[in-house]
Structures are given as C-alpha cells and as structure tokens.
C-alpha cells in the first residue's frame, strides 16, 4: 500500500551537524596533553607570550633550553608567540615527559581557537600522542631487556 502524494514522507530531513564553532576571541581555552606519565592542563588566554607553569616562569620550571624550545614550538609554527599567555598545571613524569605533554596541550588549544592552524600543527606532528611508554622489567633480567652476563663454562 502506498502513501498518498499529499502526505509528508515518513523520514524528515535531519538538520546537518554544523562544524564545531570556534571559541570566541578573548575567552580562555582549556586543554589536556599527556606524554609518558605526565599530564598537563593548559589555559590559553590572549596576552603577550607569558608562561605560568605551576606558579613559575618557563625559565624557572624548565631551565633546559631544549625543553623551552620544544614547548614554544606550536606557537612558533603558527606564528603566534606573542599572542597568548599560557597557564599550566603539570603533574607526574619528569621534565622530558612534561615538556612533551605541554607541547601537545598548547597545540590542541591553538586548534580549538582556530581550526585553520590544524594542518600546519598536524604536519609538524604536534597533535599526535606519543604513545611510547616505559617497558616493564621482566623477572630473570636486570632491566626490561638487559640480561645478566652469560657464562658458557
């Protein structure tokens, strides 16, 4: 049996989901980054390029210049080093893990603010979670893979 032509079809056209609306300018953006055992929560606020990491400046918290450069990399890639202030809470892991987690969190926040930055950050590998973890120690071995010295006789 067919429905009369003047009736509406049984399935209505569903509204098409819009792309995620960008965060309005001037509003802080919060994101999370993880690497190894480190978890970092970042608030990105329009400002002049300041860093507050657990209440300390970037130079105090990360005295290593390599880590400082790694952390600023997402802002340098999208050419906005002087545009945002970064406030972050860092927990767990060591300096290397925390620096990597902070880098990822900043990159995610930049994408949330402006989706046009995504291709550049993705190409630079800043939006990809580094899934490498410490391998567990096995019994009978000295470390994860290091075996005790073997003597044939």
Swiss-Prot record:
GO terms for molecular function: RNA binding; structural constituent of ribosome. One of its GO terms (biological process) is translation. Residues 129-138 have a biased composition (Basic and acidic residues). Residues 139-153 have a biased composition (Basic residues). Residues 1-19 have a biased composition (Low complexity). Signal peptide: none annotated. Residues 1-23, 121-153 are annotated as: Disordered. Belongs to the universal ribosomal protein uS9 family. This is Small ribosomal subunit protein uS9.
């Amino acid at each position: 049996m067919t429905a009369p032509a003047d009736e509406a079809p049984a399935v209505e056209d569903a509204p098409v989901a819009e792309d995620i609306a960008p965060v309005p300018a001037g509003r802080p953006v919060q994101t999370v980054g993880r690497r190894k055992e480190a978890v970092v929560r970042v608030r990105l606020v329009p400002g002049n390029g300041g860093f507050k990491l657990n209440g300390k400046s970037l130079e105090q918290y990360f005295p290593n210049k390599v880590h400082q450069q790694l952390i600023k990399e997402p802002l340098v890639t999208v050419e906005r080093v002087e545009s945002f202030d970064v406030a972050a809470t860092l927990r767990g892991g060591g300096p290397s893990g925390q620096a990597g987690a902070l880098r990822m969190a900043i990159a995610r926040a930049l994408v949330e603010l402006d989706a046009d930055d995504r291709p550049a950050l993705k190409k630079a590998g800043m939006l990809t979670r580094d899934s490498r973890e410490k391998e567990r120690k096995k019994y009978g071995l000295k470390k994860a893979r290091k075996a005790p010295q073997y003597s044939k006789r």
